[in-house]
Amino acid sequence: MKVKTRFAPSPTGFLHVGGARTALYSWLFAKNQGGEFVLRIEDTDLERSTQEAIDAIIEGMEWLELNWDEGPYYQTKRFDRYNGLIDEMLADGRAYKCYCSKERLEALREGQMANGEKPRYDGKCRDHAHDHPADAPHVIRFRNPTEGSVVFDDHVRGRIEFANTELDDLIIRRTDGAPTYNFCVVVDDWDMEITHVVRGEDHINNTPRQINIYKALNAPVPEFAHVSMILGDDGAKLSKRHGAVSVMQYRDDGYLPEALLNYLVRLGWSHGDQEIFSLEEMIKLFSLDAISKSASAFNTDKLLWLNNHYMRSLDPAYVAKHLAWHMADQKIDTSKGPALADVVTLLAERCNTLVEMAAQSRYLFEEYEAIDEAAAKKHLRGVAAEPLTLAKAKLAALDSWTTEALHELIEATAAELGQGMGKVGMPLRVAVTGLGQSPGIDAVMALVGKERVLARIDRALAYIEARMAAE
């Protein structure tokens, strides 16, 4: 049997991290088993579904590179298929028309709740639908079994059993003729030959109802794995108040997809004590049975740590492609300046996100607006004029503009003045970057370029002269 899984989001909002983890688990299992992964858009909620949400889901999946083998399929394009089956079920008694008004159903619900009962349809129209005019407004309900139970072995939670007496007769077609979610899902999984359904634990109560529909259609029942919810660091269900919950918000905040995928796979799945997983390792090691039943808490600090790891360990040229988006977002013109891969190499050790990296690289591409006041007060005093002037003369004559040659030049300048490296390096750092902290100034100058370095030293010398005159 070929394994086939699916990710089937409803396009009523962005792709959130819980959905992304579900998609990842489903995708990994398919790849681990040599199977196929399907993307399906469950857009039967016509009032809430939007094209904007569909675009956001697809964009998120593409950014994570969770590529699908089939799809995207859209439920709204399959209404004829669903309604054809419903008509067949209606004709042979597997479904029936229900004429109960909203007012009656609401009163029924309120009465049951007042008596401490579980709200459920009482089956009034189950055997009396013929008492109403055929063209009167109605819904179609599935005739759920009234005896026995539904049992399934969940890959995460083990054996789960529901008595059929706990289940009511589900509406499978609304008054407006639109088929409902629980019915469409079953038909889709049947038609698309889905063998394993990975989804959130909030779908557990849907599962017995869907299994009964599979059986009524004489369709094979897939296996299920219901994963636990993701909590915020305060133990509450993850929500917007915990920070970013949209996958693309993590992109915007400067995370690499590899970091987010690595983090998400560990939110409920583990392989020993291993924390770092390449995508190839995830595919090789992943199994549904190793998913934890317990809810997992989202820890932003750990995600930042992983992001820093991938910024440092991935090919700088690859990281640079993602950095380019953030440079443009921060309106930094990179057309005149160092290669972005070199910027990644320079700054990866010092940054946790690509947003930070873009911000910290600005002086490599454009002139800084002002020198940091605290850094200038400490390092651009009158005594700094001599080492800056000597260093500038040597830099102007330097033919080999490399990190190594620049390091040797700073050493030679310090030796000639009989001073420590810091007495030359720190004034140069403030002059070239406008900041009190940066990576090694030799590496920085190598990327800034000779012309800009000399001009910035002139700017710093003018600053020192003006400061001394004011004193």
UniProtKB/Swiss-Prot annotation:
One of its GO terms (molecular function) is zinc ion binding. Keywords: Aminoacyl-tRNA synthetase, ATP-binding, Cytoplasm, Ligase, Metal-binding, Nucleotide-binding, Protein biosynthesis, Zinc. Its EC number is 6.1.1.17. InterPro entries: aa-tRNA-synth_I_cd-bd, aa-tRNA-synth_I_codon-bd_sub2, aa-tRNA-synth_I_CS, aa_tRNA-synth_I_cd-bd_sf, Glu-tRNA-ligase_bac/mito, Glu/Gln-tRNA-synth, Glu/Gln-tRNA-synth_Ib_cat-dom, GluQ/Sye. Zn(2+) binds at residues 98, 100, 125, 127. It is an enzyme of class 6 (ligase). Its cofactor is Zn(2+). A motif ('KMSKS' region) lies at residues 237-241. It comes from the Bacteria. A motif ('HIGH' region) lies at residues 9-19. Binds 1 zinc ion per subunit. Monomer. Belongs to the class-I aminoacyl-tRNA synthetase family. Glutamate--tRNA ligase type 1 subfamily. Catalyzes the attachment of glutamate to tRNA(Glu) in a two-step reaction: glutamate is first activated by ATP to form Glu-AMP and then transferred to the acceptor end of tRNA(Glu). This is Glutamate--tRNA ligase. The gene is gltX.
